[in-house]
């Protein structure tokens, strides 16, 4: 059955509500209900019933189920690492290295490298990198605006470029919700990484800024202020959030409790990918590898906690479930996104939009348009996950229908979504970067804005060019 114009009403309504309410859950929920109403012919009660069952149907996909389970396990892993002193142990080791840092440039580069090492979570990266680097950044008179800029740029953007964590499950899940076959999701994701220009520029552009001291506009003023007056913030600004952000573990610092589980996670993922791919990791079973990696990593940290007498068996199980609970909001967005994606497929929204825009919009401009729309939505809502959940089910089906490179459009969607996480003043990583470095939020947004706009502009041009080439 063809739904015509009505097939675009639910996704458009979802986008508008996300922009107005800043609440992705409510927006997706209303989008799911509206989609079900359109599919059943407009009967509200039937639509409500169908919307309920659409959530159940989401679990018929093994890929969706594995993704959600893996995400919860990642939450348990990170939580137990923190509670067992793993993060504190790693922090202690890094602090011992600060005696080797003698210059501002060295401090900036060390902060960048530390952000690269912490790749499992954008929030965790902000917390660890910001708190570890702050003492020597402050001692060497690095303005808090510069510290926050580096900490922020190496958090979520790097997690997306190096997704050996819960991000692997999330990004692959968004691809499948957009119509990419489950057995091809990991391959498409890997091919999209070199095409995620915004994240590449954000991470390595920040390295260039650190190496060569490229200070633009407000950042130049911040550097001059720190150099001339010794003040790391504008008068009366900065530092207020630091104590709230820090919640260190009471356990004895144990770096092993971070390095061993993370090593098991990475090694298991690579091993299962190689085995299931018959020697070729890119052809391996990505979702199964992530699930096994998470299971063995969680098992490893649980054994360490019990062996070190930090928790009893019952206590470590309770702590594990507490950790899973920390990931429920993100898992909820994933579930809602998967469900919305299934309904949008049933509405055939992608093919309808393709038929409408074919005569008006060159298919080659789809990657650039996808990037731009995701930028705007993520900046307004402050959420990359929510933007990916909403826009993947719109942009990817159009790419499939138009015959446009799916990795290129996926890179555009993911990069545009990360722009908001990176640039928006209401993003959680923006707040956390400022909290751990002691920077005022508005000062951080103002000083990094010239850089992120340059990165975004270059990315947009590349998507326009490659849209015609690929």
Which residues are covered by each model-predicted region?
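Membrane-embedded alpha-helical segments and adjacent helix-loop junctions characteristic
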Residues: 45-148, 310-402
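Alpha-helical transmembrane segments of multi-pass membrane proteins
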Residues: 103-118, 142-168, 182-201, 222, ...
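Short helical (or helix-break) motifs at transmembrane helix termini and adjacent helical loops
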Residues: 127-136, 417-432
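Helix-coil boundary and interhelical linker segments in multi-pass alpha-helical membrane proteins
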Residues: 396-408, 465-470
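Hydrophobic transmembrane alpha-helices of multi-pass small-molecule transporters
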Residues: 1-71, 197-199, 210-211, 227-339, ...
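Membrane-core helix-loop-helix motifs of multi-pass transport proteins
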Residues: 136-231, 248-256, 430-462, 467-470
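Generic transmembrane alpha-helix motif of multi-pass integral membrane proteins
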Residues: 11-22, 373-378, 397-399, 434
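Structural signature of hydrophobic alpha-helical transmembrane segments
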Residues: 1-8, 290-296, 355-366, 415-423
């Amino acid at each position: 059955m063809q739904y015509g114009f009505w097939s675009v009403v639910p996704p458009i309504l979802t986008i508008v509500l996300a922009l107005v309410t800043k609440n992705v859950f409510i927006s997706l929920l209303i989008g799911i209900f509206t989609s079900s109403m359109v599919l059943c012919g407009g009967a509200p009660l039937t639509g409500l019933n169908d919307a309920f069952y659409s959530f159940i149907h989401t679990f018929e996909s093994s890929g969706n189920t594995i993704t959600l389970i893996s995400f919860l396990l990642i939450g348990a892993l990170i939580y137990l690492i923190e509670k067992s002193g793993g993060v504190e142990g790693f922090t202690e080791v890094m602090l011992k290295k600060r005696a080797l840092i003698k210059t501002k440039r060295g401090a900036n580069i060390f902060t960048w490298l530390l952000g690269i090492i912490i790749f499992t979570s954008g929030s965790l990266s902000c917390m660890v990198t910001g708190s570890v680097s702050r003492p020597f950044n402050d001692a060497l008179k690095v303005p808090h605006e510069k510290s926050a800029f580096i900490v922020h740029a190496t958090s979520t953007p790097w997690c997306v470029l190096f997704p050996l964590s819960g991000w692997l499950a999330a990004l692959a899940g968004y691809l499948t919700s957009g119509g990419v076959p489950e057995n091809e999701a990991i391959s498409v994701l890997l091919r999209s990484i070199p095409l995620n220009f915004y994240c590449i520029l954000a991470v390595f552009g920040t390295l260039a800024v650190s190496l060569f001291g490229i200070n633009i506009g407000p950042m130049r003023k911040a550097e001059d202020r720190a150099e001339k007056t010794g003040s790391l913030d504008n008068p009366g600004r900065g530092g207020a959030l630091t104590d709230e952000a820090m919640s260190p573990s009471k356990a004895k610092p144990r770096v092993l409790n971070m390095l061993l589980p993370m090593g098991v996670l990475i090694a298991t993922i690579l091993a299962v990918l190689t085995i299931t791919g018959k020697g070729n990791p890119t052809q391996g079973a990505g979702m199964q590898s992530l699930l096994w990696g998470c299971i063995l990593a969680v098992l490893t940290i649980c054994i360490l906690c019990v062996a070190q007498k930090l928790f009893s068996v019952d206590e470590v199980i309770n702590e594990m479930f507490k950790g899973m609970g920390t990931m429920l909001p993100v898992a909820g967005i994933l579930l809602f996104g998967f469900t919305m994606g299934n309904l949008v497929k049933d509405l055939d929204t992608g093919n309808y939009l393709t038929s409408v825009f074919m005569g008006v919009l060159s298919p080659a401009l789809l990657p650039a348009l996808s990037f731009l729309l995701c930028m705007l939505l993520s900046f307004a809502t402050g959420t990359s996950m929510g933007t990916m959940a909403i826009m993947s089910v719109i942009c990817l089906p159009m790419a499939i229908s138009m015959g446009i490179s799916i990795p290129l459009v996926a890179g555009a969607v993911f990069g545009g979504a990360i722009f908001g996480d990176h640039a928006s003043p209401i993003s959680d990583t923006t707040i956390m970067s400022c909290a751990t470095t002691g920077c005022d939020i508005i000062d951080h947004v103002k000083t990094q804005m010239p850089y992120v706009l340059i990165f975004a502009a270059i990315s947009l041009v590349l998507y326009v060019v490659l849209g015609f080439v690929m």
